[in-house]
Amino acid sequence: MSTRIEPIDTSAAPEETLRALHELYLVRDEELEPIGDPPVPFEQRLVDWRNLLETEAIPRFALWEGTRVIATSGVFMDLEQNLDNAFGWVYVHPDHRGSSHGRSVAAPMFDEAETSGRSRFAFQINQGRPEERLAELAGMKPAFTGKRSRLSFPELDWSLMDLWVKRAEERAVDYELVFMRSPVDDEYLQPFCDLTEVMNTAPREDYEEEDEVITPEMWRDIEVKDEAKCKDVLFYVARHVATGALVGYTEVALPRLQPDLAWQGDTAVDPAHRNLGLGRWLKAAMALRLREEYPTVTRIDTHNAGSNAPMLSINVEMGFSPILIETVWQGDLATLRQRLSV
């Protein structure tokens, strides 16, 4: 049967088109995501695809065989920052590999990155996958190793959480925690955006990128899109009482269409305020809040740099266990196109 490649604008494509793409993603998830996870519902994927940020471009492509999508590619590009970088993906249905479909569907993805002036390109590949060899042949480097870890929420040691709170209240007497729920109150908006820049101190290993800045306008767009994606987003922020300065925070996102799941996002403390137990205090307080307000949550997933020993230590103490090791491969776009002949 003949095939064709078409772009897909997920913000406007017919629902029937997105259902066909979703069916391929279900196959992809079963192959690449943790074994036994419930499938992502189409309704969740639909709202995620529909609601893109104003500061991002995500061109996608589908290789069709009749009414079925058998391969896909896409590329994420920030429109405000890190304008040299592009982050892409290619997936071919297992039953259709070995026919150059991957190369075919990758070509328009690379074209988009090139047209947008990107010089560096990255892929994320699960450790041990055969695609790692292809990345090597393309001249890419393993730039960043990430650990995806999971906490079985019902098995969390609540006495340990209480202990972390107690210890922090004794050690960090000059600080208090402030609970916030998206959208962030106007009075905290600029200080909170400034606080997020502390994430620029997190390990990047050999991944090449610039520091990122989030403006209040960007943050408000994130909040609007999170709500459209049916996500509750919660924060605890550590505040220095004497100065009122915000010095640390932790963030959790809860997809309402997947009520068993919580995503642990950023947790960071200003370097000038570390070694007082603020990180553990923030995470323990959030866990206690989730137990009270979100009783359906059974699993909390998070991503960390493999080299981020302090945060991994906290997570291990809480009971997080690695479920995936993912390597980000990065290279020169022109070089990898030449070596892959695509």
Question: Model segments located where?
Answer:
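Conserved beta-strand-loop-alpha-helix junction that forms the acyl-donor binding cleft
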Residues: 97, 122-132, 270-274, 300-312, ...
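Active-site/acyl-donor-binding loops of N-acyltransferases
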Residues: 138-157, 234, 288-342
